[in-house]
Amino acid sequence: MTTRGFRLDQDNRLNNFAIEPEVYVDSSVQAGWTKYAEKMNGRFAMIGFASLLIMEVVTGHGVIGWLNSL
């Protein structure tokens, strides 16, 4: 039973702790080509491409030329 944000147990004792959400088990397999993995891969690729462009603008050399100068 719930009354005004407080929960009473079966013996009508007050439980003034926070009401916890229902617990569930996600039994689906989360390996391989998931949507989350694809989003993260795309985001890291965009960050890498943008950093290469910034490096080329700052140094004045392309990536291959910069690697040859090392």
From Swiss-Prot:
Q: Where is the major localization of this protein? A: membrane
Q: Which InterPro entries match?
A: Chloroa_b-bind
The residues that cross the membrane are 31-58
Q: Upon deletion of the gene, what happens?
A: Single deletion mutant and double hliA-hliB deletions are out-competed by wild-type in high light (500 umol photons/m(2)/s). Quadruple hliA-hliB-hliC-hliD deletions die rapidly in high light but grow normally in normal light (40 umol photons/m(2)/s). Quadruple mutants are sensitive to norflurazon. In a quintuple hliA-hliB-hliC-hliD-hemH deletion chlorophyll half-life decreases 2-fold while the half-life of PSII proteins does not change; photosystem II assembly intermediate RC47(1) is missing (RC47(1) is PSII monomer without CP43). De novo chlorophyll synthesis is very slow.
Picking any one GO molecular function of the record gives:
pigment binding
Motif annotated as Chlorophyll-binding motif, chain positions: 38-43
Query: What Gene Ontology cellular-component terms does the record carry?
Result: photosystem II; plasma membrane-derived thylakoid membrane; thylakoid membrane
Protein localization: Cellular thylakoid membrane
How does the record classify its membrane topology? Single-pass membrane protein
At the top level of its lineage, which domain of life is listed?
Answer: Bacteria
Q: What induces it?
A: Transcription strongly induced in the absence of photosystem I (PSI), probably a monocistronic operon. Mildly increased translation in the absence of PSI (at protein level). Expressed at very low levels during growth under normal light (40 umol photons/m(2)/s), induced under high light (500 umol photons/m(2)/s for 6 hours) with maximal expression by 1 hour and decreasing after, after growth at 4 degrees Celsius for 6 hours, less induced after nitrogen or sulfur deprivation (at protein level). Upon return to normal light protein levels drop rapidly.
**Pfam families (alphabetical):** Chloroa_b-bind
Residue ranges that the UniProt entry lists as topological domain Cytoplasmic: 1-30
Taken from the record's topology, the Lumenal, thylakoid segments are 59-70
Q: One of this protein's GO BP terms?
A: energy quenching
Mutation effect (K35A): Increased accumulation in the absence of HliC, mutation mimics HliB
Provide this UniProt record's keywords sorted from A to Z.
Membrane, Photosynthesis, Photosystem II, Pigment, Stress response, Thylakoid, Transmembrane, Transmembrane helix
Which family does this protein fall into? Answer: Belongs to the Hlip family.
The free-text function statement in the UniProt record for this protein reads: Involved in photosystem II (PSII) assembly and/or repair under high light stress; probably important during long-term acclimation to stress. HliA-HliC heteromers associate with PSII assembly intermediates containing CP47 (psbB) and bind chlorophyll and carotenoids in a 1:0.6 ratio. They probably protect against photo-oxidation during assembly. The complex binds mostly beta-carotenoid, but minor amounts of echinenone and beta-crytoxanthin are also detected. Accumulation of this protein requires HliC. The complex efficiently quenches chlorophyll fluorescence, contributing to photoprotection. The Hlips might regulate tetrapyrrole biosynthesis, maybe at the level of aminolevulinic acid synthesis and probably stabilize PSII assembly intermediates.
How would you summarize the oligomeric state and partners of this protein?
Answer: Forms heterodimers with HliC, these are associated with photosystem II (PSII) assembly intermediates containing CP47 (psbB). Cofractionates in an approximately 100 kDa fraction the thylakoid membrane with HliB (ScpD). Co-migrates with photosystem II (PSII); the same complex includes HliB and 3 FtsH homologs. Even in the absence of PSII, does not associate with photosystem I (PSI). HliA/HliB and Psb34 probably bind to a similar site on CP47; their binding seems to be mutually exclusive.
Protein name, please? Answer: High light-inducible protein HliA
- Where does this protein come from, organism-wise? Synechocystis sp. (strain ATCC 27184 / PCC 6803 / Kazusa)
